[in-house]
Amino acid sequence: MRKNVGHSLRKSVAALAVTVVLLPTTGAAQSLEQAVASALDTHPQIRQAFNRFKASEELIKQAESGYYPTLDFDAGIGREWTESPSTRRDSAQYGVGEEVELTRREIGVSLRQVLFNGFQTMNEVERSEYEASADQWALFSSAEDLALEVTRAYLEFLRAEQIVVLAERNLESHQIIYDQVKQKTDSGLGSTADLSQVTGRLARAHSNLISAQNNLSDARIVYQKLVNTTPEDMRIPVPDALMLPESLTQALDMAKTSHPTLKSANNDIQAATAQRDATKGNYYPQVTFDLSASWDDNLDGNDGTTANPFDSPADVGGNSDEVLAIVRLNYNLFSGGADRAREREAAYSINESKAIQQEAYRDIVEGTTLAWNAREFLNQQMQYLRQHVEASIETRNAYEDQFKLGQRTLIDVLDSENELFQARREYLTAEYDDLIARYRLLNATGQLLESLRITIPEVWSGEDNYKGGVQS
């Protein structure tokens, strides 16, 4: 009986005798690059960041409007009832009513050009440019982080898919063993104890498969949420080794130089500084050039006629026309301490931005170091996991041979088979963890999108090359 079971066992698990490796799929496949590009095009998080950046660009235009003159036109027509000293005087002298009712008409146009406002316009433009640049780099940072999320989901799905394959093959081998043992037991040639043992192991194999299928289902949902498509025909990606840092020091230097989150935080500091400079403009006078013209009729109860019948001419018309060109200076001498308070507020905002930048710096150093350490330790771990797989294969094969000779029990063979399954699963998990660690390192240094050769949308470059922004 043991000889037959051992022979069946060797046949049933022959497909599992190879070491677990990452095997790319064939045919039409959805690459990691395609998945990331799709996510960047459709994910709401990126759309939020993009629209925030575009809104900041409009703030630049609002600030730049301070360099240009304002032109206003006004017109009006309506009935006016007037009782004034002049109407009462006419009433007393000539016996007319004290109230005058006329149709009043007004037309006017005015132009104002700010000549000097304490450099407020210049500083506001600078502030808005730095804020737009900060939002632009925040957009790129969001894209980097989303690319890492998609990469992780992509690899997690592939890993879950391959673990399901392992679990299915493990169940298949246990099912064959169970069928052989049950057949022998039913014919009276086998032991009920052997049947109980293999039944328990078969149940665990079923449980392992269900757990693997559950993990695969979860991985599919995570992927669909990020990419908005169903994962199909995926292939194992290969990180760009040339872009990976060769040391932790190099990785940290790359992160400090290239990470978009740090660049965004630096621009926030510059924007806060420009805001403080803009508040100082309140200490200076404002000089404007005003040009205006007005054409009015029947103002203030005066229609150009006289109540004195002896005046000549009796009607000179009620129109009043005026053209004015004047340079004005306005200097606020006291504002209740508001100007000083605004300056202090801006100073605190600078300190806040610096603290945010320092926090971002620490986070990036932490993330880079963790990614580097994960890669280093996984490289060390994998050689032992590989040895574990190889040793488990040898042990399983030896136990099968010994089982046929009656030197090993069925439980020994089942234990060796289960250990091989666990060893392969651990090695497979470590291989994918190593891949994820490499992509984490590319993300931590701000190089992930570039390493994936993702084409950045043209609109992300902005309408101009702003101070501190992404230069196109």
PLM features per residue range, with description:
Residues 48-63, 142, 146-165, 176, ...:
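Amphipathic alpha-helical coiled-coil segments
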Residues 27-76, 82, 114-115, 231-270, ...:
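Bacterial Sec-pathway N-terminal export signals of envelope proteins
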Residues 74-113, 237-244, 277, 290-331, ...:
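Small/polar, glycine/serine/threonine/aspartate-rich low-complexity segments that form flexible
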Residues 3-7, 81, 426-472:
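Acidic, low-complexity, intrinsically disordered peripheral segments
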Residues 37-47, 54-70, 101, 109-126, ...:
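A glycine-/polar-enriched beta->alpha junction
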Residues 126-129, 192-203, 344, 410-418:
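Short, charged, amphipathic alpha-helical segments
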Residues 14-24:
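Bacterial N-terminal signal peptides
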Residues 2-7, 145-258, 374, 378, ...:
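Periplasmic alpha-helical coiled-coil/stalk elements that build and connect Gram-negative outer-membrane
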